[in-house]
Protein backbone atom coordinates (compact mmCIF):
# COMPACT_ATOMS: atom_id res chain seq x y z
CA UNK A 1 0.00 0.00 0.00
CA UNK A 2 1.04 3.64 -0.12
CA UNK A 3 3.46 5.09 2.36
CA UNK A 4 0.78 7.25 3.95
CA UNK A 5 -0.19 6.27 7.48
CA UNK A 6 -3.78 6.79 8.51
CA UNK A 7 -4.66 7.45 12.13
CA UNK A 8 -7.45 5.53 13.78
CA UNK A 9 -9.47 8.62 14.57
CA UNK A 10 -13.18 9.24 14.22
CA UNK A 11 -13.96 12.75 15.35
CA UNK A 12 -16.45 13.09 18.20
CA UNK A 13 -18.13 15.84 16.17
CA UNK A 14 -19.27 13.22 13.67
CA UNK A 15 -21.27 11.56 16.42
CA UNK A 16 -22.60 14.81 17.87
CA UNK A 17 -23.84 16.00 14.47
CA UNK A 18 -26.16 13.00 14.34
CA UNK A 19 -28.41 14.24 17.12
CA UNK A 20 -31.58 12.45 16.17
CA UNK A 21 -33.82 10.28 18.27
CA UNK A 22 -33.07 6.81 16.98
CA UNK A 23 -33.12 4.19 19.70
CA UNK A 24 -33.40 0.84 17.98
CA UNK A 25 -30.78 -0.45 20.39
CA UNK A 26 -32.28 0.93 23.59
CA UNK A 27 -34.65 -1.94 24.25
CA UNK A 28 -35.29 -5.51 23.16
CA UNK A 29 -38.99 -4.74 22.97
CA UNK A 30 -40.33 -5.20 19.43
CA UNK A 31 -42.03 -2.11 18.10
CA UNK A 32 -45.45 -1.90 16.50
CA UNK A 33 -46.50 -0.19 13.31
CA UNK A 34 -46.40 3.61 13.17
CA UNK A 35 -49.01 5.27 15.35
CA UNK A 36 -51.96 6.99 13.57
CA UNK A 37 -50.79 10.54 14.28
CA UNK A 38 -48.01 12.50 15.90
CA UNK A 39 -48.46 13.39 19.56
CA UNK A 40 -49.44 16.99 20.25
CA UNK A 41 -48.19 19.29 22.99
CA UNK A 42 -49.36 22.45 24.70
CA UNK A 43 -46.03 24.24 24.25
CA UNK A 44 -42.52 23.77 22.85
CA UNK A 45 -41.19 23.16 26.36
CA UNK A 46 -43.80 20.43 26.84
CA UNK A 47 -42.65 18.83 23.58
CA UNK A 48 -38.99 19.01 24.54
CA UNK A 49 -39.53 17.49 27.96
CA UNK A 50 -41.60 14.66 26.48
CA UNK A 51 -38.88 14.00 23.92
CA UNK A 52 -36.32 13.76 26.70
CA UNK A 53 -38.50 11.34 28.67
CA UNK A 54 -38.96 8.88 25.80
CA UNK A 55 -35.27 9.08 24.95
CA UNK A 56 -34.41 8.08 28.52
CA UNK A 57 -37.05 5.34 28.66
CA UNK A 58 -35.90 3.37 25.62
CA UNK A 59 -39.57 2.72 24.77
CA UNK A 60 -39.61 2.41 21.00
CA UNK A 61 -43.38 2.66 20.70
CA UNK A 62 -43.27 5.89 22.69
CA UNK A 63 -40.68 7.29 20.29
CA UNK A 64 -42.91 6.50 17.32
CA UNK A 65 -45.82 8.04 19.19
CA UNK A 66 -43.94 11.31 19.49
CA UNK A 67 -43.25 11.62 15.76
CA UNK A 68 -46.25 9.86 14.22
CA UNK A 69 -46.78 8.14 10.85
CA UNK A 70 -43.82 7.72 8.53
CA UNK A 71 -41.31 8.07 11.34
CA UNK A 72 -40.24 4.45 11.83
CA UNK A 73 -37.93 4.16 8.82
CA UNK A 74 -36.50 7.59 9.49
CA UNK A 75 -35.74 7.54 13.21
CA UNK A 76 -34.55 3.92 13.36
CA UNK A 77 -31.29 3.09 11.60
CA UNK A 78 -29.79 -0.29 10.77
CA UNK A 79 -27.16 -0.08 13.52
CA UNK A 80 -28.56 -0.64 17.05
CA UNK A 81 -25.26 0.14 18.78
CA UNK A 82 -24.94 3.43 16.98
CA UNK A 83 -28.57 4.28 17.69
CA UNK A 84 -28.08 3.74 21.41
CA UNK A 85 -25.04 6.02 21.45
CA UNK A 86 -26.97 8.67 19.52
CA UNK A 87 -29.73 8.71 22.12
CA UNK A 88 -27.22 8.99 24.97
CA UNK A 89 -25.59 11.96 23.23
CA UNK A 90 -28.96 13.65 22.75
CA UNK A 91 -29.91 13.20 26.41
CA UNK A 92 -26.58 14.56 27.66
CA UNK A 93 -26.72 17.56 25.32
CA UNK A 94 -30.35 18.37 26.16
CA UNK A 95 -29.74 18.21 29.89
CA UNK A 96 -26.62 20.37 29.57
CA UNK A 97 -28.50 23.14 27.76
CA UNK A 98 -31.57 23.54 25.58
CA UNK A 99 -33.72 26.32 24.17
CA UNK A 100 -36.18 26.96 21.36
CA UNK A 101 -35.69 29.25 18.37
CA UNK A 102 -38.69 30.69 16.53
CA UNK A 103 -38.39 30.50 12.75
CA UNK A 104 -39.87 32.97 10.20
CA UNK A 105 -42.64 30.51 9.28
CA UNK A 106 -43.76 30.26 12.91
CA UNK A 107 -42.23 26.85 13.58
CA UNK A 108 -39.84 26.25 16.48
CA UNK A 109 -36.43 24.56 16.33
CA UNK A 110 -34.93 22.86 19.39
CA UNK A 111 -31.31 23.85 20.08
CA UNK A 112 -29.33 21.62 22.42
CA UNK A 113 -25.91 21.55 24.04
CA UNK A 114 -23.33 24.26 24.53
CA UNK A 115 -22.92 24.53 20.75
CA UNK A 116 -26.66 25.08 20.16
CA UNK A 117 -26.95 22.20 17.73
CA UNK A 118 -30.27 22.20 15.91
CA UNK A 119 -32.57 19.20 16.34
CA UNK A 120 -33.48 18.23 12.76
CA UNK A 121 -37.27 17.90 13.22
CA UNK A 122 -39.11 21.23 13.55
CA UNK A 123 -42.07 21.76 15.87
CA UNK A 124 -45.19 23.28 14.25
CA UNK A 125 -48.51 24.55 15.61
CA UNK A 126 -51.74 23.13 14.19
CA UNK A 127 -55.10 24.85 13.70
CA UNK A 128 -56.12 23.92 17.24
CA UNK A 129 -53.13 25.70 18.71
CA UNK A 130 -51.34 22.46 19.63
CA UNK A 131 -47.72 21.72 18.80
CA UNK A 132 -46.38 18.62 17.01
CA UNK A 133 -43.09 17.51 15.47
CA UNK A 134 -43.17 17.66 11.65
CA UNK A 135 -41.36 14.44 10.68
CA UNK A 136 -41.81 15.10 6.95
CA UNK A 137 -40.04 18.44 7.21
CA UNK A 138 -37.13 16.89 9.11
CA UNK A 139 -36.72 13.73 7.03
CA UNK A 140 -34.09 14.93 4.57
CA UNK A 141 -31.99 16.58 7.27
CA UNK A 142 -32.10 13.46 9.46
CA UNK A 143 -30.94 11.16 6.69
CA UNK A 144 -28.31 13.63 5.46
CA UNK A 145 -26.75 13.87 8.93
CA UNK A 146 -26.79 10.12 9.55
CA UNK A 147 -25.47 9.18 6.12
CA UNK A 148 -22.81 11.87 6.12
CA UNK A 149 -21.56 10.88 9.56
CA UNK A 150 -21.45 7.19 8.69
CA UNK A 151 -19.67 7.66 5.38
CA UNK A 152 -16.98 9.88 6.90
CA UNK A 153 -16.45 7.35 9.67
CA UNK A 154 -16.26 4.44 7.21
CA UNK A 155 -13.60 6.22 5.15
CA UNK A 156 -11.49 6.43 8.32
CA UNK A 157 -12.17 2.78 9.13
CA UNK A 158 -11.16 1.61 5.64
CA UNK A 159 -7.83 3.38 6.03
CA UNK A 160 -7.33 1.86 9.48
CA UNK A 161 -8.05 -1.63 8.13
CA UNK A 162 -5.53 -1.16 5.32
CA UNK A 163 -2.89 -0.03 7.81
CA UNK A 164 -3.69 -3.03 10.01
CA UNK A 165 -3.13 -5.42 7.11
CA UNK A 166 0.22 -3.82 6.32
CA UNK A 167 1.27 -4.24 9.97
CA UNK A 168 0.03 -7.84 10.01
CA UNK A 169 2.09 -8.63 6.89
CA UNK A 170 5.26 -7.26 8.50
CA UNK A 171 5.24 -10.11 11.05
CA UNK A 172 4.93 -13.89 11.01
CA UNK A 173 1.92 -15.45 12.70
CA UNK A 174 0.91 -18.90 13.93
CA UNK A 175 4.49 -20.17 13.42
CA UNK A 176 4.20 -19.50 9.70
CA UNK A 177 7.31 -19.51 7.51
CA UNK A 178 6.03 -16.94 5.04
CA UNK A 179 4.58 -13.49 5.52
CA UNK A 180 0.97 -13.08 4.48
CA UNK A 181 -2.11 -10.95 5.10
CA UNK A 182 -4.93 -11.81 7.50
CA UNK A 183 -7.83 -13.84 6.13
CA UNK A 184 -10.41 -12.34 8.46
CA UNK A 185 -11.05 -9.41 10.77
CA UNK A 186 -11.37 -11.23 14.11
CA UNK A 187 -9.08 -14.19 14.89
CA UNK A 188 -10.41 -17.56 15.97
CA UNK A 189 -9.73 -18.24 19.68
CA UNK A 190 -6.07 -19.01 20.37
CA UNK A 191 -4.91 -18.02 16.89
CA UNK A 192 -3.68 -14.97 15.00
CA UNK A 193 -5.44 -15.67 11.70
CA UNK A 194 -7.32 -12.37 11.85
CA UNK A 195 -6.44 -8.71 12.28
CA UNK A 196 -7.54 -8.70 15.90
CA UNK A 197 -6.73 -11.06 18.77
CA UNK A 198 -6.62 -10.69 22.52
CA UNK A 199 -3.20 -9.53 23.64
CA UNK A 200 -1.02 -11.85 25.70
CA UNK A 201 2.49 -11.59 27.14
CA UNK A 202 5.26 -12.44 24.70
CA UNK A 203 3.00 -12.12 21.66
CA UNK A 204 2.91 -9.29 19.11
CA UNK A 205 0.14 -6.75 19.56
CA UNK A 206 -3.00 -7.01 17.48
CA UNK A 207 -2.85 -4.63 14.47
CA UNK A 208 -6.54 -3.89 14.82
CA UNK A 209 -6.32 -3.36 18.56
CA UNK A 210 -6.68 0.47 18.55
CA UNK A 211 -9.77 0.36 16.31
CA UNK A 212 -11.39 -2.46 18.29
CA UNK A 213 -10.65 -0.59 21.52
CA UNK A 214 -12.29 2.52 20.10
CA UNK A 215 -15.28 0.50 18.89
CA UNK A 216 -15.71 -1.14 22.28
CA UNK A 217 -16.12 2.27 23.92
CA UNK A 218 -19.10 2.79 21.61
CA UNK A 219 -20.67 -0.53 22.57
CA UNK A 220 -19.49 -2.74 19.70
CA UNK A 221 -18.12 -6.21 20.48
CA UNK A 222 -15.37 -8.07 18.61
CA UNK A 223 -16.77 -11.48 17.70
CA UNK A 224 -15.44 -13.95 15.14
CA UNK A 225 -17.74 -14.67 12.20
CA UNK A 226 -20.24 -12.04 13.32
CA UNK A 227 -22.30 -10.13 10.77
CA UNK A 228 -23.29 -6.89 12.43
CA UNK A 229 -22.98 -3.35 11.05
CA UNK A 230 -20.29 -0.97 12.28
CA UNK A 231 -21.27 2.69 11.90
CA UNK A 232 -24.11 1.53 9.67
CA UNK A 233 -21.86 -0.47 7.32
CA UNK A 234 -20.95 -4.10 6.68
CA UNK A 235 -17.30 -4.95 5.93
CA UNK A 236 -16.04 -7.94 3.95
CA UNK A 237 -12.64 -9.08 2.71
CA UNK A 238 -11.98 -9.75 -0.98
CA UNK A 239 -9.38 -12.33 -2.07
CA UNK A 240 -8.53 -11.17 -5.58
CA UNK A 241 -8.43 -8.13 -7.85
CA UNK A 242 -9.70 -7.54 -11.37
CA UNK A 243 -8.24 -6.13 -14.56
CA UNK A 244 -9.10 -2.52 -13.66
CA UNK A 245 -6.90 -2.57 -10.55
CA UNK A 246 -3.29 -1.38 -10.59
CA UNK A 247 -1.14 -4.35 -11.66
CA UNK A 248 -4.02 -6.09 -13.41
CA UNK A 249 -6.01 -9.15 -12.44
CA UNK A 250 -4.53 -11.53 -9.90
CA UNK A 251 -5.51 -13.90 -7.14
CA UNK A 252 -4.33 -12.88 -3.68
CA UNK A 253 -4.36 -16.48 -2.44
CA UNK A 254 -1.36 -18.83 -2.63
CA UNK A 255 -1.57 -22.25 -0.97
CA UNK A 256 -4.42 -21.11 1.24
CA UNK A 257 -2.71 -17.91 2.39
CA UNK A 258 -3.39 -14.34 1.32
CA UNK A 259 0.04 -13.41 -0.03
CA UNK A 260 -0.36 -11.29 -3.15
CA UNK A 261 -2.44 -8.49 -1.69
CA UNK A 262 -5.69 -7.74 0.11
CA UNK A 263 -8.88 -5.78 -0.38
CA UNK A 264 -12.01 -4.80 1.54
CA UNK A 265 -15.51 -3.75 0.60
CA UNK A 266 -17.76 -1.70 2.89
CA UNK A 267 -21.42 -1.21 2.03
CA UNK A 268 -24.40 0.32 3.88
CA UNK A 269 -26.48 -2.02 6.01
CA UNK A 270 -29.59 -0.20 4.83
CA UNK A 271 -29.24 1.78 1.61
CA UNK A 272 -30.50 5.34 1.90
CA UNK A 273 -30.80 5.08 5.67
CA UNK A 274 -27.43 4.11 7.15
CA UNK A 275 -25.45 5.11 4.05
CA UNK A 276 -25.47 5.53 0.28
CA UNK A 277 -21.96 4.98 -1.06
CA UNK A 278 -20.16 1.62 -1.18
CA UNK A 279 -16.37 1.69 -0.67
CA UNK A 280 -13.51 -0.59 -1.77
CA UNK A 281 -9.81 -0.39 -0.87
CA UNK A 282 -6.79 -2.60 -1.60
CA UNK A 283 -3.12 -3.03 -0.69
CA UNK A 284 -2.11 0.00 -2.77
CA UNK A 285 -4.16 2.25 -0.48
CA UNK A 286 -6.51 3.08 -3.34
CA UNK A 287 -9.97 3.89 -1.92
CA UNK A 288 -12.92 4.09 -4.32
CA UNK A 289 -16.61 4.77 -3.87
CA UNK A 290 -19.75 4.08 -5.90
CA UNK A 291 -23.50 4.41 -5.48
CA UNK A 292 -24.83 0.91 -6.17
CA UNK A 293 -28.45 2.02 -5.86
CA UNK A 294 -31.39 0.30 -4.24
CA UNK A 295 -29.93 -3.16 -4.90
CA UNK A 296 -26.77 -2.30 -2.94
CA UNK A 297 -27.07 -5.22 -0.50
CA UNK A 298 -27.38 -7.84 -3.24
CA UNK A 299 -24.86 -6.21 -5.59
CA UNK A 300 -22.21 -5.66 -2.90
CA UNK A 301 -22.61 -9.17 -1.50
CA UNK A 302 -21.89 -10.56 -4.96
CA UNK A 303 -18.64 -8.60 -5.36
CA UNK A 304 -15.67 -10.91 -4.76
CA UNK A 305 -12.80 -8.89 -6.22
CA UNK A 306 -11.31 -5.41 -6.10
CA UNK A 307 -12.06 -4.13 -9.59
CA UNK A 308 -12.69 -0.36 -9.78
CA UNK A 309 -14.19 -0.31 -13.26
CA UNK A 310 -16.37 2.44 -14.71
CA UNK A 311 -18.44 4.21 -12.08
CA UNK A 312 -16.00 3.75 -9.20
CA UNK A 313 -14.61 7.15 -8.19
CA UNK A 314 -11.42 7.71 -6.13
CA UNK A 315 -12.07 9.14 -2.66
CA UNK A 316 -10.09 12.32 -2.17
CA UNK A 317 -8.32 12.60 1.20
Residue ranges and their predicted role:
Residues 168-273:
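Flexible, glycine-rich surface segments
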Residues 21-25:
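C-terminal motif of bacterial Sec signal peptides marking the signal peptidase cleavage site
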Residues 26-53, 101, 139-163, 167:
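Short, low-complexity N-terminal intrinsically disordered segments enriched in polar/charged residues
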Residues 59-71, 178-185:
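Short, well-ordered alpha-helical segments enriched in acidic and aromatic residues
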Residues 71-119, 224, 228-229, 236, ...:
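Surface-exposed, charged secondary-structure patches
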